[in-house]
């Protein structure tokens, strides 16, 4: 889609000038913010970050490969053409909005306190059954990643899926204004990032910004089980949504999950969904999902609702999930052997908040045998942090955890109120924990059948999982994790 804009149109849109009048002779097919990923006919956006400045890498661009850059300060020694602008980030956002306005692809947007990245990945998988699909890579969902998704969209894209994240109020409104989605979903309202807010209501307000820039006739997809459903429904209507679909286990859900049974290779799900214009008649579909944690079942219902909102066949979409397996860091299981003892690792180390932590513990409880956990601090909880961590003590007692390795000051404080029979080992950070992890596990392995690793990315839980898979799993599993991380 970037190729629809000539170099001069790029300059006009961004209110910029090509350095020394050197205007490229060809158009660009995509933008990058990492010079190492640059390919032929691509445009490098030189951004100034906290630790790196993209302007330092302009000299690496190759004009012979039709590469150029958008810059704030030109590099006279660079051979590639440079478009000088006041703000490289603002230029990226302007170009992305122009692409969003020009595309004929159906534009999907989704956000939520938990589950948005996994739901995005499921939706992406489903949509590929119907045509070329372009989606947010990983969790590139902020004011850089979301515009970059648009700037990398191929010309033939029929379905565009953008994940929108936020840490503060107003951020989703800005991203929605760039994208102008036709179909917008909220997975749930929960306490992730609550440290930046005063209440869950404020989080609901911020998530509802998703509907602020609907295209005409937009459809909202909402979590029927959520406490804030009625509020979100009203917000979507006020924003001009012409249609609202709900998902969940609630009897009034349009896409109602009625069954989720764990089977050998994942889960078997049954979802009731409307098939007539007035949504008064329902059909039932049973399908397989190659995931093990039950919260993925509701996410699947959300993705199905998004497909239906686009007029796509629900049954065809559902078949795409039969091989949609557990994702590293989001509940994927690995078979470990520690000291001759077989242990199943539940790698949920991608991130953590109070709601997702409880879901992970509930999922662990469904596995038979003795269960251990390695938990690192949940971050960005602000004044709610202490209580959120202390609550875990009750939850772990209820699900019958045998032992815990606690990483970080908040998790360490939580262990003070655990029952005497639950063995605890505490470390100040993941670096120290890694130094002693092998000897700890040598002592704990005999009393462990299943092991959950979970925590915020910033507190290093993912480093623990990477070490466990690399050290105690098969070569193929280790390679799989490395490829996905």
Which residues does each PLM region occupy?
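Mobile, glycine- and charge-enriched loop segments
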Residues: 37-46, 133-134, 144, 148-160, ...
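Acidic, Mg2+-coordinating active-site environments of NTP-dependent enzymes
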Residues: 75-79, 185-343, 369, 394-403, ...
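Short acidic-hydrophobic, aromatic-tinged amphipathic segments that line or gate anion-handling sites
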Residues: 83-87, 424-433
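Residue-level signal for inorganic ion chemistry
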Residues: 10, 42, 61, 95, ...
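Phosphate-binding loop of NTP-binding sites
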Residues: 8-14, 91-224, 230-241, 439, ...
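Rossmann-fold NAD(P)-dependent oxidoreductase module
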Residues: 60, 98, 122-126, 320, ...
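N-terminal leader/targeting and accessory segments in enzymes
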Residues: 1-94, 98, 292, 312, ...
